[in-house]
Amino acid sequence: MSKPTVALLYICTGKYTVFWPDFYKTFRQNYLPECDKTFFVFTDAPSIEFDTEPDVRRIYQKALDWPYSTLKRFEMFLTQEDALKAFDFLFFANANLLCEQVVTAEEFLPRTEQGEVLLMVQQPGFWDKTPPFYSYDRNPKCRAYIPYNCGRDYVSGGLNGGTAPAFLALCHTLARRTDDDLADGVIALWHDESQLNRYVAELDPAEYRLLTPAYWYPEDWHIPFEPKITVRDKSKWIDMTAVKGKKPELGFVARKWDAFCQNYLPFVLAVRDTLLLKHLPRYKAGHNP
Protein backbone atom coordinates (compact mmCIF):
# COMPACT_ATOMS: atom_id res chain seq x y z
CA MET A 1 0.00 0.00 0.00
CA SER A 2 1.44 3.39 -1.01
CA LYS A 3 2.00 6.14 1.54
CA PRO A 4 -0.39 9.09 1.63
CA THR A 5 1.17 12.10 -0.09
CA VAL A 6 1.25 15.40 1.79
CA ALA A 7 2.24 18.88 0.61
CA LEU A 8 3.28 21.29 3.36
CA LEU A 9 2.76 24.93 2.36
CA TYR A 10 5.24 27.28 3.99
CA ILE A 11 5.76 31.03 3.54
CA CYS A 12 9.03 32.67 4.60
CA THR A 13 9.60 36.00 2.90
CA GLY A 14 11.83 38.73 4.26
CA LYS A 15 13.13 38.14 7.77
CA TYR A 16 10.93 35.07 8.26
CA THR A 17 13.52 32.90 6.52
CA VAL A 18 15.26 32.65 9.90
CA PHE A 19 12.63 30.11 11.00
CA TRP A 20 12.95 27.76 8.03
CA PRO A 21 15.92 25.50 8.99
CA ASP A 22 14.46 24.37 12.33
CA PHE A 23 10.98 24.08 10.88
CA TYR A 24 12.22 21.82 8.12
CA LYS A 25 14.34 19.62 10.37
CA THR A 26 11.63 19.04 12.99
CA PHE A 27 8.74 18.60 10.56
CA ARG A 28 10.74 16.33 8.29
CA GLN A 29 11.62 14.09 11.23
CA ASN A 30 8.49 14.11 13.39
CA TYR A 31 5.47 15.24 11.37
CA LEU A 32 3.42 12.50 9.72
CA PRO A 33 6.28 9.98 9.48
CA GLU A 34 3.96 7.51 7.73
CA CYS A 35 3.42 9.94 4.83
CA ASP A 36 5.42 11.02 1.79
CA LYS A 37 5.94 14.75 2.45
CA THR A 38 6.93 17.58 0.11
CA PHE A 39 7.66 21.12 1.33
CA PHE A 40 6.43 23.96 -0.90
CA VAL A 41 8.41 26.99 0.31
CA PHE A 42 7.22 30.41 -0.87
CA THR A 43 10.11 32.84 -0.42
CA ASP A 44 11.86 35.85 -1.93
CA ALA A 45 15.26 34.47 -0.88
CA PRO A 46 17.49 33.49 -3.85
CA SER A 47 18.38 30.35 -1.91
CA ILE A 48 17.47 28.73 1.39
CA GLU A 49 19.00 25.97 3.42
CA PHE A 50 17.98 22.49 2.21
CA ASP A 51 16.53 23.77 -1.07
CA THR A 52 18.47 21.12 -2.98
CA GLU A 53 16.77 18.32 -1.03
CA PRO A 54 14.36 16.27 -3.16
CA ASP A 55 11.45 16.98 -0.80
CA VAL A 56 11.81 20.79 -1.01
CA ARG A 57 10.37 23.00 -3.75
CA ARG A 58 11.43 26.64 -3.51
CA ILE A 59 8.89 28.96 -5.14
CA TYR A 60 9.62 32.63 -5.69
CA GLN A 61 7.22 34.88 -3.81
CA LYS A 62 7.69 38.62 -3.58
CA ALA A 63 7.68 39.94 0.00
CA LEU A 64 4.43 41.82 0.53
CA ASP A 65 3.83 44.63 3.01
CA TRP A 66 1.78 43.93 6.13
CA PRO A 67 -1.02 42.85 6.18
CA TYR A 68 -1.00 41.67 2.56
CA SER A 69 1.65 39.08 3.38
CA THR A 70 -1.01 37.22 5.34
CA LEU A 71 -4.15 38.37 3.49
CA LYS A 72 -2.86 37.07 0.18
CA ARG A 73 -1.69 33.63 1.29
CA PHE A 74 -4.63 31.78 -0.28
CA GLU A 75 -3.82 33.47 -3.58
CA MET A 76 -0.17 32.43 -3.20
CA PHE A 77 -1.10 28.78 -2.76
CA LEU A 78 -3.29 28.84 -5.86
CA THR A 79 -0.28 29.75 -8.03
CA GLN A 80 0.77 26.13 -7.46
CA GLU A 81 -2.68 24.61 -7.85
CA ASP A 82 -1.78 22.30 -10.72
CA ALA A 83 1.09 20.76 -8.75
CA LEU A 84 -0.90 20.58 -5.51
CA LYS A 85 -3.77 18.68 -7.10
CA ALA A 86 -1.48 15.65 -7.31
CA PHE A 87 -1.25 15.27 -3.52
CA ASP A 88 -3.65 13.51 -1.19
CA PHE A 89 -3.48 16.17 1.55
CA LEU A 90 -2.41 19.82 1.76
CA PHE A 91 -1.50 21.65 4.97
CA PHE A 92 -0.42 25.22 5.64
CA ALA A 93 1.93 25.80 8.57
CA ASN A 94 3.12 29.11 9.97
CA ALA A 95 6.81 29.89 9.60
CA ASN A 96 7.56 29.83 13.33
CA LEU A 97 6.34 26.32 14.17
CA LEU A 98 8.40 23.46 15.58
CA CYS A 99 7.29 19.82 15.58
CA GLU A 100 9.40 18.38 18.38
CA GLN A 101 7.10 15.44 19.18
CA VAL A 102 5.99 12.75 16.75
CA VAL A 103 2.63 13.62 15.17
CA THR A 104 1.11 10.59 13.48
CA ALA A 105 -1.24 10.36 10.54
CA GLU A 106 -3.82 8.66 12.76
CA GLU A 107 -3.98 11.61 15.14
CA PHE A 108 -3.72 14.41 12.58
CA LEU A 109 -5.18 13.63 9.16
CA PRO A 110 -8.87 14.24 8.43
CA ARG A 111 -10.78 11.00 8.96
CA THR A 112 -12.22 10.78 5.48
CA GLU A 113 -14.01 7.53 6.29
CA GLN A 114 -16.08 9.59 8.76
CA GLY A 115 -16.76 12.36 6.25
CA GLU A 116 -14.02 14.75 7.40
CA VAL A 117 -12.27 16.62 4.59
CA LEU A 118 -10.59 19.48 6.49
CA LEU A 119 -8.27 19.78 9.50
CA MET A 120 -8.43 22.70 11.94
CA VAL A 121 -6.73 23.46 15.26
CA GLN A 122 -8.25 25.36 18.18
CA GLN A 123 -6.69 28.77 18.74
CA PRO A 124 -5.19 28.56 22.25
CA GLY A 125 -6.43 31.99 23.29
CA PHE A 126 -10.04 30.83 23.05
CA TRP A 127 -10.11 27.12 23.89
CA ASP A 128 -11.96 27.79 27.17
CA LYS A 129 -14.28 30.56 25.92
CA THR A 130 -17.70 30.58 24.25
CA PRO A 131 -18.51 32.01 20.78
CA PRO A 132 -19.70 35.48 21.89
CA PHE A 133 -16.22 36.03 23.34
CA TYR A 134 -14.29 34.81 20.32
CA SER A 135 -12.30 37.34 18.35
CA TYR A 136 -14.42 36.90 15.23
CA ASP A 137 -14.78 39.75 12.76
CA ARG A 138 -17.95 41.58 13.84
CA ASN A 139 -18.10 44.07 10.96
CA PRO A 140 -21.26 43.36 8.87
CA LYS A 141 -19.57 44.93 5.84
CA CYS A 142 -16.84 42.28 5.90
CA ARG A 143 -17.22 38.88 4.25
CA ALA A 144 -15.63 37.35 7.36
CA TYR A 145 -18.45 38.72 9.55
CA ILE A 146 -19.92 36.43 12.22
CA PRO A 147 -22.81 37.65 14.43
CA TYR A 148 -22.40 37.34 18.20
CA ASN A 149 -24.99 34.56 18.40
CA CYS A 150 -23.30 32.44 15.73
CA GLY A 151 -20.15 30.40 15.37
CA ARG A 152 -18.98 27.28 17.10
CA ASP A 153 -15.17 26.97 17.15
CA TYR A 154 -12.35 29.49 16.91
CA VAL A 155 -9.57 28.01 14.80
CA SER A 156 -6.00 29.05 14.20
CA GLY A 157 -5.04 30.57 10.89
CA GLY A 158 -1.52 29.19 11.22
CA LEU A 159 -2.05 25.42 10.92
CA ASN A 160 -4.83 24.00 8.81
CA GLY A 161 -5.47 21.93 5.73
CA GLY A 162 -7.32 18.95 4.38
CA THR A 163 -7.75 16.79 1.34
CA ALA A 164 -6.38 18.47 -1.76
CA PRO A 165 -9.81 19.11 -3.37
CA ALA A 166 -11.33 20.47 -0.14
CA PHE A 167 -8.39 22.72 0.74
CA LEU A 168 -8.01 24.11 -2.78
CA ALA A 169 -11.74 24.88 -2.83
CA LEU A 170 -11.29 26.70 0.49
CA CYS A 171 -8.39 28.70 -0.99
CA HIS A 172 -10.47 29.73 -4.01
CA THR A 173 -13.37 30.89 -1.84
CA LEU A 174 -11.25 32.82 0.65
CA ALA A 175 -9.02 34.39 -2.00
CA ARG A 176 -12.16 35.65 -3.76
CA ARG A 177 -13.78 36.92 -0.56
CA THR A 178 -10.56 38.69 0.43
CA ASP A 179 -10.30 40.40 -2.96
CA ASP A 180 -13.96 41.42 -2.83
CA ASP A 181 -13.42 42.92 0.63
CA LEU A 182 -10.35 44.83 -0.57
CA ALA A 183 -12.33 46.18 -3.52
CA ASP A 184 -14.84 47.51 -0.96
CA GLY A 185 -12.07 49.03 1.17
CA VAL A 186 -12.50 46.40 3.91
CA ILE A 187 -9.85 44.26 5.63
CA ALA A 188 -10.91 41.44 7.94
CA LEU A 189 -10.01 41.91 11.60
CA TRP A 190 -7.42 39.13 11.80
CA HIS A 191 -6.93 38.88 8.04
CA ASP A 192 -6.75 35.29 6.77
CA GLU A 193 -7.67 33.88 10.20
CA SER A 194 -10.93 35.83 10.27
CA GLN A 195 -11.80 34.67 6.76
CA LEU A 196 -10.99 31.08 7.73
CA ASN A 197 -13.19 31.21 10.82
CA ARG A 198 -16.15 32.46 8.80
CA TYR A 199 -15.64 29.59 6.35
CA VAL A 200 -15.52 27.05 9.18
CA ALA A 201 -18.62 28.56 10.82
CA GLU A 202 -20.56 27.84 7.62
CA LEU A 203 -19.70 24.13 7.66
CA ASP A 204 -21.25 21.09 9.25
CA PRO A 205 -18.78 20.27 12.07
CA ALA A 206 -18.73 16.67 10.84
CA GLU A 207 -16.75 17.88 7.81
CA TYR A 208 -13.65 18.98 9.69
CA ARG A 209 -11.42 17.44 12.30
CA LEU A 210 -10.73 19.80 15.20
CA LEU A 211 -7.54 19.33 17.19
CA THR A 212 -6.71 20.85 20.58
CA PRO A 213 -4.13 23.60 21.18
CA ALA A 214 -1.60 20.81 21.81
CA TYR A 215 -0.93 21.22 18.08
CA TRP A 216 -0.62 25.01 18.31
CA TYR A 217 1.07 25.53 21.66
CA PRO A 218 2.64 29.00 22.09
CA GLU A 219 6.12 29.11 23.54
CA ASP A 220 6.19 30.01 27.27
CA TRP A 221 2.42 29.54 27.68
CA HIS A 222 0.92 27.34 30.37
CA ILE A 223 -2.33 25.71 29.24
CA PRO A 224 -3.54 22.19 30.10
CA PHE A 225 -2.29 20.43 26.98
CA GLU A 226 0.84 18.42 26.24
CA PRO A 227 2.66 20.32 23.45
CA LYS A 228 2.96 18.47 20.16
CA ILE A 229 3.63 21.43 17.84
CA THR A 230 5.14 24.58 19.36
CA VAL A 231 4.67 28.17 18.20
CA ARG A 232 7.92 30.04 18.64
CA ASP A 233 7.79 33.62 19.91
CA LYS A 234 8.57 35.65 16.79
CA SER A 235 9.73 38.65 18.80
CA LYS A 236 12.72 36.65 20.07
CA TRP A 237 13.93 36.30 16.50
CA ILE A 238 12.81 39.34 14.53
CA ASP A 239 11.67 42.91 15.20
CA MET A 240 7.91 42.56 14.91
CA THR A 241 7.30 46.32 15.14
CA ALA A 242 9.27 46.67 11.91
CA VAL A 243 6.93 44.14 10.29
CA LYS A 244 3.54 45.13 11.72
CA GLY A 245 4.16 48.57 13.19
CA LYS A 246 3.89 49.60 16.83
CA LYS A 247 0.50 49.38 18.51
CA PRO A 248 -0.62 52.63 20.16
CA GLU A 249 -0.70 52.57 23.96
CA LEU A 250 -4.17 52.91 25.49
CA GLY A 251 -4.96 55.45 28.17
CA PHE A 252 -6.75 54.55 31.43
CA VAL A 253 -10.28 55.16 30.15
CA ALA A 254 -9.57 53.36 26.89
CA ARG A 255 -8.19 50.36 28.79
CA LYS A 256 -11.30 50.17 30.98
CA TRP A 257 -13.57 50.41 27.96
CA ASP A 258 -11.58 47.73 26.17
CA ALA A 259 -11.90 45.42 29.20
CA PHE A 260 -15.67 46.02 29.31
CA CYS A 261 -15.98 45.28 25.58
CA GLN A 262 -14.08 42.02 25.99
CA ASN A 263 -15.63 40.73 29.21
CA TYR A 264 -19.25 41.96 29.35
CA LEU A 265 -20.51 43.56 26.15
CA PRO A 266 -20.55 40.29 24.14
CA PHE A 267 -23.32 38.96 26.42
CA VAL A 268 -25.55 41.89 25.46
CA LEU A 269 -24.69 41.69 21.78
CA ALA A 270 -25.36 37.94 21.65
CA VAL A 271 -28.86 38.55 23.05
CA ARG A 272 -29.40 41.34 20.53
CA ASP A 273 -28.34 39.19 17.57
CA THR A 274 -30.51 36.31 18.79
CA LEU A 275 -33.57 38.58 19.00
CA LEU A 276 -32.76 39.87 15.51
CA LEU A 277 -32.68 36.23 14.30
CA LYS A 278 -29.22 36.65 12.85
CA HIS A 279 -27.73 33.50 11.38
CA LEU A 280 -25.12 32.20 8.97
CA PRO A 281 -25.77 30.13 5.84
CA ARG A 282 -24.71 26.49 5.90
CA TYR A 283 -22.68 25.03 3.05
CA LYS A 284 -21.05 21.74 2.28
CA ALA A 285 -17.24 22.05 2.27
CA GLY A 286 -16.06 23.17 -1.14
CA HIS A 287 -19.39 24.73 -2.08
CA ASN A 288 -19.14 27.98 -0.12
CA PRO A 289 -19.81 30.92 -2.50
Can you describe what each PLM-predicted range is?
Residues 1-69, 80-86, 256-261, 265-281:
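N-terminal anchoring/stem segment of glycosyltransferases
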Residues 13-15, 46-47, 63-64, 97-99, ...:
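Short, solvent-exposed loop/turn segments at secondary-structure junctions
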Residues 46-55, 106-111, 222:
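Short loop/helix-cap segments at secondary-structure boundaries that form the rim of catalytic
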Residues 51-64, 74-76, 115-118, 226-230:
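Active-site regions of enzymes building and remodeling cell-envelope glycoconjugates
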Residues 61-93, 101, 191-200:
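A conserved donor-nucleotide-binding helix/loop in the catalytic core
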Residues 99-140:
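Conserved donor-nucleotide/metal-binding helix-loop-beta segment in metal-dependent transferases, i.e.
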Residues 146-236:
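Catalytic core and acceptor-binding pocket of nucleotide-sugar-dependent glycosyltransferases
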Residues 202-289:
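C-terminal catalytic/acceptor-binding lobe
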